[in-house]
From Swiss-Prot:
<feature type="binding site">
    <location>
        <position position="388"/>
    </location>
    <ligand>
        <name>Zn(2+)</name>
    </ligand>
</feature>
<dbReference type="GO" id="GO:0003911">
    <property type="term" value="F:DNA ligase (NAD+) activity"/>
</dbReference>
<dbReference type="InterPro" id="IPR004150">
    <property type="entry name" value="NAD_DNA_ligase_OB"/>
</dbReference>
<protein>
    <recommendedName>
        <fullName>DNA ligase</fullName>
        <ecNumber>6.5.1.2</ecNumber>
    </recommendedName>
</protein>
<feature type="binding site">
    <location>
        <position position="412"/>
    </location>
    <ligand>
        <name>Zn(2+)</name>
    </ligand>
</feature>
<feature type="binding site">
    <location>
        <position position="406"/>
    </location>
    <ligand>
        <name>Zn(2+)</name>
    </ligand>
</feature>
<dbReference type="InterPro" id="IPR041663">
    <property type="entry name" value="DisA/LigA_HHH"/>
</dbReference>
<dbReference type="InterPro" id="IPR012340">
    <property type="entry name" value="NA-bd_OB-fold"/>
</dbReference>
<keyword id="KW-0520">NAD</keyword>
<dbReference type="GO" id="GO:0006281">
    <property type="term" value="P:DNA repair"/>
</dbReference>
<dbReference type="InterPro" id="IPR033136">
    <property type="entry name" value="DNA_ligase_CS"/>
</dbReference>
<dbReference type="GO" id="GO:0005829">
    <property type="term" value="C:cytosol"/>
</dbReference>
<dbReference type="InterPro" id="IPR001679">
    <property type="entry name" value="DNA_ligase"/>
</dbReference>
<dbReference type="Pfam" id="PF01653">
    <property type="entry name" value="DNA_ligase_aden"/>
</dbReference>
<keyword id="KW-0464">Manganese</keyword>
<dbReference type="InterPro" id="IPR001357">
    <property type="entry name" value="BRCT_dom"/>
</dbReference>
<dbReference type="Pfam" id="PF12826">
    <property type="entry name" value="HHH_2"/>
</dbReference>
Length: 670
């Protein structure tokens, strides 16, 4: 049978692509191409139910993580692509319900991220699973716990509650990462790390969008209000309406604003707002009847790939870049597209001179989808070089890594350019007026060979002015901006060094812990022989072996130590200070037990903003223990060591304007 043969082929395709998408985090085709295959498969299944092929959802959970069975299946959504299909879906749904009156929908953005299902028992997070195959997912609870603002404990909820949502990376964060093809893949790769410290550095975000049954909640819109009231992040961009013109107007509005939204959206989801109707509508084999996804059209165009050039990143990652014959897509002129890595280049067999299909679908960087082979004549296969295009050093590629790297970090001109570009960025020294072209010029002419040379440029003032394009005013403005940027906080200085895995958040925590540059640098210089300092770093909330290894690798190199010392001699590094009264400045806190009126994450933020430091384990160096309900062994240990105990109420009073929390000595050890 022809139908059976086609269904079998489509089924095998879906299995392969689901594995690439859900388990490998490296999809080979676009969402639009996947949707086309899946829609064709489902239509053939409906027309040939006797053939007995299964509906494909997700992919079995990886063996790397513990498995979690979902309370109810995590289904996918059927798609529509036009107003006509929307009207047809609404009418079909009303016929199913035998409903004559209007049917209200809640319209929400469809985030292009990674789905999760978090389970709470008696208000405490006990598991958090990926979609997996829709029935069983991977337990990523440790990684979810480090996502900023994700509740670990919640109050006033059913004894058993399952909250679902989407984890994503915003565009700004994605731009700081290397080696990922798009924000969705980066989010998936970050969320499925075996080391939560790496996840912590990636600044993942999330939106919660549904919950299991809650007494008294009757509408989807109320579910979002309920979740928001208990500390979950929900997307404020939504509309409740029963009118197709209003729904389409909202769809068009979000679509037009898509490029201004700081995260990827690939459509809207329309959900029947009345939760009582969800049970009546039930589900299809792979999707609920009470919801549908209205996908955005992708922006695509064909153009000639004129050249493949290699870009060298700050950490040495080599990225192939397609230089295109300029083409306008969605009102934007596109002349370049990332080819991501050597594997991607080989898999798609992309060659110089090819006619390629380019897509700009809300991603930060346009992507080359595929090659139009019918146009190809005698183009030669692109051979990925084994030498760095900037310094000619031999490139290396570690096992199980997609990235190819140049390890000549100190002598590779392009890496030095990117390192100094990082140093002068707004998040570091914030030196206005110095761009890539300026840095390249300074390096080429020998004015800069290391970061500290930026602050020695005034010695070359007269020489710089002799070159074409360098007028008196432009040179003086740059030198003035450099002079005005010499004063820098300790956390920004640490971040400016570009140490692997040391982002802004980690730099702040290190500054908070070590207070002054002298103290921090002394401790880092002796880190390889100082297990006490290593333990001190590991014990900081959100830190661990990954951060320690990065610091150890960096400061084990005497050239790096000399570079930091040289840079520090040309700037003024201010000690870490907190400007909220300073009442908790330098005080170390440990939490134990369950907080009732605020979440533990909120309490941590209160302490950090007031200059305090949150650590994970009890020692003689701890100043306070914040004890909630059902406090455990940490409370007993605190009593043994004579550490002051703070009740939740006392901490709340402090946030309302009181000074340092009143201390009390606990005698109980429950």
């Amino acid at each position: 049978m022809e139908a059976k043969k086609e269904i079998q082929e489509l089924y095998e395709k879906l299995l392969r692509h689901n594995k690439k998408y859900y388990q490998d985090d490296s999809p080979e085709i676009t969402d639009a191409e996947y949707d086309s295959i899946k829609d064709r498969y489902l239509k053939l299944l409906e027309a040939n139910p006797s053939l007995g092929f299964p509906v494909v959802v997700g992919y079995p959970a990886s063996e790397k993580f513990q498995k979690v069975k979902h309370l109810s299946p995590m289904l996918s959504l059927r798609n529509i692509f036009s107003e006509e299909e929307l009207v047809e879906y609404i009418e079909k749904t009303k016929r199913f319900l035998n409903l004559k009156s209007a049917l209200e929908f809640l319209c929400e953005p469809k985030i292009d991220g990674v789905s999760f299902s978090a389970r709470y028992v008696n208000g405490k997070l006990v598991s958090c699973a990926t979609r997996g195959d829709g029935k069983i997912g991977e337990n990523i609870i440790d990684n979810m716990k480090v996502i900023n603002g994700f509740p670990i404990e919640i109050m006033d909820v059913p004894d058993l509650l399952e909250v679902r949502g989407e984890v994503f990376l915003d565009h700004d964060t994605f731009q700081t990462l290397e080696g990922f093809s798009n924000p969705r893949n980066a989010a998936a790769g970050s969320l499925r790390q075996l080391n939560p410290e790496i996840t912590n550095e990636r600044n993942l975000q999330y939106f919660a969008y549904s919950a299991s049954k809650i007494d008294g909640i009757e509408h989807q819109e109320d579910v979002l209000h309920f979740l928001s009231g208990r500390g979950f992040m929900t997307n404020p961009l939504r509309l409740a309406s029963s009118k197709v013109p209003e729904i389409m107007s909202f769809y068009d509005s979000v679509y037009r604003r898509r490029s201004q939204i700081k995260y990827d959206i690939d459509g809207l989801v329309y959900k029947v707002n009345d939760l009582k109707l969800h049970a009546r509508l039930g589900t299809l084999s792979d999707a609920p009847r009470w919801a549908i996804a209205h996908k955005f059209p992708s922006h695509r165009a064909k153009t000639i790939l004129e050249k493949i050039k290699l870009s060298v990143g700050r950490t040495g990652i080599i990225t192939p870049v397609a230089h295109l014959k300029p083409i306008t897509i969605g009102g934007v002129v596109i002349s370049r597209a990332s080819l991501y890595n050597e594997d991607e280049l080989e898999r798609k067999d992309i060659r110089e001179g090819d006619l390629v299909i380019v897509e700009r679908a809300g991603d930060v960087i346009p992507k080359v989808l595929e090659v139009d082979i019918s146009y190809r004549t005698n183009q030669e296969r692109f051979i990925f070089p084994d030498k760095c295009p900037s310094c000619s050093s031999t490139l290396i590629r570690k096992n199980n890594e997609a990235a190819t790297r140049c390890n000549n970090s100190k002598k590779c001109p392009e890496q030095v350019i990117q390192q100094i570009k990082h140093l002068v960025s707004a998040q570091a020294f914030d030196i206005d007026g110095i761009g890539t072209s300026h840095i390249s010029f300074f390096i080429e002419k020998g004015f800069i060979s290391e970061p500290a040379d930026i602050f020695r440029l005034d010695k070359h003032r007269d020489e710089i002015k002799k070159y074409d394009g360098w007028g008196e005013k432009s040179v003086e403005n740059i030198l003035k901006n450099i002079k005005n940027s010499r004063k820098i906080s300790l956390e920004k200085f640490i971040f400016s060094l570009g140490i692997k895995n040391i982002g802004e958040k980690t730099a702040y925590m290190l500054a908070q812990q070590f207070k002054s540059f002298a103290n921090w640098f002394d401790k880092m210089s002796m880190l390889k022989d100082d297990t006490q300092t290593e333990d001190e770093i590991r014990n900081l909330d959100g830190m661990g072996s990954c951060i320690c290894e990065s610091l150890l690798d960096f400061f084990s190199d005497s050239d790096n130590c000399n570079m930091v010392k040289s840079l520090s001699n040309h700037v003024m590094i201010t000690d870490h200070t907190v400007n909220i009264g300073g009442s908790l400045s330098g005080k170390k806190f440990v939490f134990t037990g369950t907080l009732l009126s605020i979440t533990r994450e909120e309490a941590k933020e209160i302490i950090k903003k007031a200059g305090g430091i949150v650590v994970n384990s009890i020692s003689k160096q701890i100043d306070y223990v914040v004890a909630g309900e059902k406090a455990g062994s940490k409370l007993a240990k605190a009593n043994e060591l004579g550490i002051a105990i703070i009740e939740e109420k006392t901490l709340i009073e402090f946030t309302n304007g009181n000074n340092t929390p009143a201390l009390k000595k606990e005698t109980s050890s429950n």
